[in-house]
């Protein structure tokens, strides 16, 4: 299963990182950083669906998505055409991402940045904050309840927000017992990589939406998808593949932003 391969490779990465990382020094450096940008606030526009536009070069299921990939240019196009926040894939082995993409985008963009990776260990959170992440993705399906709680609380402690991702009812119920206020519903089953927007509709039935900011992730490609998700009360959408594979990326961003309600009369 691809997910098990990803976890195994990520744990090896973490082992290598821990051999060289000075965690005490990392913690000290974090105390010197300015406050992170408010990722959740950037998404919340009453009655609208905000776009988290993703910097995505490749995927395990489809390979290289964007042959002429330029992370800085993508970030500029996304921001100048109405994205509310940016997601930066930093996994190298399966998504051809780099942590340096996040660091470099932080220097040029004023939008909140989400580090999208497979976070399994506290050292990755320290690394993320120092690289410029304002929020990180925590995938409930990859973590035990204890691990999720530990990482979630550490995010808060070091001034980052966590977008906590769920795909099943069981995962959602587990996350709802935490203090998570930013929940991502992944329409992609990570064991099969199949997508279905009905996943968001199904899981939303269990959420008191007034208290929680909901992001729908994966399988979102057309303005009709945005309008459907808007009708459910979703606050944000995370879109990557549909943007980086578009013939006219700026136009595609505008299409999604307008469908979400921003730019409409």
Swiss-Prot record:
NCBIfam families per UniProt: PRK00278.2-4 (NF001377)
Family: Belongs to the TrpC family.
This protein's UniProt keywords: Amino-acid biosynthesis, Aromatic amino acid biosynthesis, Decarboxylase, Lyase, Tryptophan biosynthesis
Domain of life: Bacteria
Protein EC: 4.1.1.48
Enzyme class (EC, first level): lyase
Pfam families noted in UniProt: IGPS
HAMAP family: IGPS_B (MF_00134_B)
Molecular function GO labels: indole-3-glycerol-phosphate synthase activity; phosphoribosylanthranilate isomerase activity
Catalytic activity: 1-(2-carboxyphenylamino)-1-deoxy-D-ribulose 5-phosphate + H(+) = (1S,2R)-1-C-(indol-3-yl)glycerol 3-phosphate + CO2 + H2O
UniProt source species: Desulforamulus reducens (strain ATCC BAA-1160 / DSM 100696 / MI-1) (Desulfotomaculum reducens)
Gene Ontology BP term (one): L-tryptophan biosynthetic process
Stated name of the protein: Indole-3-glycerol phosphate synthase
Pathway noted in the entry: Amino-acid biosynthesis; L-tryptophan biosynthesis; L-tryptophan from chorismate: step 4/5
């Amino acid at each position: 299963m691809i997910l098990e391969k990803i976890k195994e490779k990520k744990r090896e990465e973490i082992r290598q990182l821990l051999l060289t990382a000075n965690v005490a020094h990392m913690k000290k450096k974090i105390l010197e950083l300015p406050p992170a940008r408010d990722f959740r606030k950037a998404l919340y526009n009453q009655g609208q669906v905000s776009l988290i536009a993703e910097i995505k070069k490749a995927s395990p299921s489809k390979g290289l998505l964007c042959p002429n990939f330029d992370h800085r240019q993508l970030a500029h196009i996304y921001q100048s055409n109405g994205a509310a926040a940016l997601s930066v894939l930093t996994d190298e082995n399966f998504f051809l991402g780099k942590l340096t993409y996040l660091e470099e985008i932080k220097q040029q963009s004023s939008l909140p940045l989400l580090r999208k990776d497979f976070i399994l260990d506290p050292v990755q959170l320290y690394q993320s904050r120092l690289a410029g992440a304002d929020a990180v993705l925590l995938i409930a399906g990859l973590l035990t309840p204890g691990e999720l709680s530990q990482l979630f609380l550490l995010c808060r402690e070091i001034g980052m927000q966590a977008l906590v991702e769920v795909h099943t009812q069981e995962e959602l119920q587990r996350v709802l017992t935490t203090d998570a206020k930013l929940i991502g519903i992944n329409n992609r089953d990570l064991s099969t990589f199949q997508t279905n927007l009905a996943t968001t509709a199904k899981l939303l039935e269990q959420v008191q939406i007034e208290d929680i900011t909901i992001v729908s992730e994966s399988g979102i490609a057309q303005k009709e998808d945005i309008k459907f998700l808007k009708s459910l009360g979703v606050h944000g959408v995370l879109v990557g593949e549909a943007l980086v594979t578009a013939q006219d990326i700026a136009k595609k961003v505008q299409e999604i932003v307008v469908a979400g309600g921003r730019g409409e009369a």
